[in-house]
């Protein structure tokens, strides 16, 4: 039922299998008559033992992992590192006389647009330009979404005042009193992952010539990996501080998190098993789909997957999302039991009349989503003009604030990748990223009875022992700066010199930031 946590599910699950009152009384009278009082205790003990072993065999049990899961509910060790992007070098000066205006149109999904905003701010800084409030592409959501419907505009502008100038709209003219020109932004398409030098030369030249340039589309059009640490710190200031959601979204998130926490700690899972995602990944066969309407939706979608690879091959190398059943097996192997409260983020997961979630729900019945926790009236409170982005925005915040976050498919998934980085920034919060390439063969062997339960548990935990669960670590080849902003956006008092040394008092002149921000995220962000 929408708007209610399913306390009844927990009660029903706990009481499952209990015998009714009257049949049990009749059975008890019969046993006393047949056996007599002397053998009754022995008989009762025998019944209890049979019942116990029967329950043990009802579903997969991973007993040796039970104690392991407790460590995941705590944050990972910080090793003396703390988030810090407020510190600026002496060379970092407030914006000077502007070279012109930068207009950007951010395309893609919710988090891809968020990353594009971060890149737009940095591009404006590189060119010493005035940034016009970024435009959010609504073709993806087919609604009237706009920046003010999702983010706190005034807070965004104020937070970045010492980094870039931001205006809400493009003025009609620009220039000195005697040399003003009518602004007509020059359309420019930057190369993918363009270098800072491209903005300092090609883009800046056109800006000075026309007074304004418009970069469209603008998503992955500024290199992620830059040697300039100050540039990377600016990205963190935008992503983790300036991009604060509107009051409506933050208030709704606060209600959702409060209701979840009333049940205890909770885990969030970004379950990428929507039909659209499977189609784009080139993995429709993993669903065993028979519904004609669903198959038609698959056929209408373009795939970004390598057409030379069959779906089974993509799956074997980890290019397909984990199935809900595999997610359940993964959780059991890691030591979580069926009392674990799980918040599912992502789109609708179904197969016509059959739910893909049934196997996962059978193992973990306490599954919640935005629609099951929030009341319809509460969802209606949010600005209707931004409804296409509100769901992902709330999901993002609920996942950010969860005790454990598990993304089942991180590529390509800006949502998961950006969340992993932000959870790292706000106190090294636990993230378990399943190694799909290593795990899928194990799940397949288990499905085919090649691997026993105990062997599956040991193998899964061995695979995951090689993965970081959220502590500070160097970026590997598969991680971008947005996935792992360490060490650029962190500091340590153990570092005696250099830009990663924690200052005695951080520069907080234009940030809602304090030394213990990562410990007070809920108070500050929600």
Residue ranges, per PLM feature:
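N-terminal targeting/anchoring "stem" of glycan-biosynthesis enzymes
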Residues: 2-526
């Amino acid at each position: 039922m929408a708007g209610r946590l399913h306390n009844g599910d927990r009660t029903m699950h706990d009481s499952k299998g209990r015998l009714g009152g009257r049949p049990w009384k009749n059975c008890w009278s019969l046993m006393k008559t047949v056996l007599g009082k002397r053998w009754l205790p022995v008989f009762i003990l025998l019944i209890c033992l049979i019942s116990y072993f029967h329950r043990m065999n009802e579903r997969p049990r991973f007993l040796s992992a039970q104690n392991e899961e407790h460590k995941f509910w705590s944050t990972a060790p910080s090793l003396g590192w703390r988030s810090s992007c407020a510190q600026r070098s002496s060379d970092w000066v407030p914006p000077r006389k502007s070279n012109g205006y930068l207009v950007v149109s951010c395309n893609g999904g919710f988090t891809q647009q968020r990353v594009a905003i971060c890149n737009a701010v940095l591009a404006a800084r590189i060119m010493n330009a005035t940034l016009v409030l970024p435009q959010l592409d609504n073709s993806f959501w087919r609604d009237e979404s706009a920046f003010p419907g999702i983010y706190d505009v005034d807070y965004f502008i104020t937070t970045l005042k010492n980094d870039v100038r931001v205006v809400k709209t493009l003025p009609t003219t620009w220039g000195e009193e005697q040399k003003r020109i009518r602004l007509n932004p020059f359309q420019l398409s930057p190369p993918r992952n363009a270098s800072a030098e491209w903005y300092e030369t090609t883009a800046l030249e056109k800006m000075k010539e026309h007074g304004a340039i418009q970069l469209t589309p603008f998503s992955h059009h500024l290199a992620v990996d830059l040697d300039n640490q100050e540039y990377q710190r600016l990205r963190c200031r935008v992503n983790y501080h300036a991009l604060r959601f509107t009051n409506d979204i933050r208030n709704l998130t606060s209600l959702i998190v409060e209701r979840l926490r009333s049940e205890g700690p909770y885990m969030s899972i970004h379950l990428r098993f929507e039909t659209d995602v499977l189609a784009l990944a080139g993995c429709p066969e993993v669903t065993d789909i028979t519904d004609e309407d669903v198959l038609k939706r698959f056929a209408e979608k373009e795939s970004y997957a390598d057409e030379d690879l069959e779906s089974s091959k993509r799956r074997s190398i980890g290019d397909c999302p984990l199935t809900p059943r595999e997610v359940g097996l993964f959780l059991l192997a890691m030591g979580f039991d069926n009392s674990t409260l799980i918040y599912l983020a992502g789109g609708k997961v179904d197969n016509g009349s059959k739910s893909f979630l049934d196997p996962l729900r059978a193992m973990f019945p306490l599954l919640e989503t935005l629609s099951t926790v929030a009341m319809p009236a509460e969802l209606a409170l949010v600005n209707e003009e931004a409804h296409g982005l509100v769901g992902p925005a709330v999901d993002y915040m609920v996942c950010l604030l969860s005790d454990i976050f598990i993304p089942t498919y991180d590529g390509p998934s800006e949502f998961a990748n950006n969340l992993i980085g932000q959870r790292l920034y706000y106190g090294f919060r636990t993230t378990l990223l399943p190694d799909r390439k290593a795990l899928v063969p194990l799940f397949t062997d288990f499905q085919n009875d090649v691997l026993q339960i105990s062997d599956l548990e040991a193998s899964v935990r061995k695979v995951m022992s090689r993965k970081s669960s959220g502590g500070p670590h160097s970026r590997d080849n598969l991680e971008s700066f947005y996935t792992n902003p360490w060490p650029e956006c962190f500091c340590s008092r153990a570092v005696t010199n250099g830009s990663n040394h924690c200052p005695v008092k951080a520069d907080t002149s234009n940030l809602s930031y304090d030394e213990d921000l990562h410990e007070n995220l809920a108070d500050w962000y929600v």
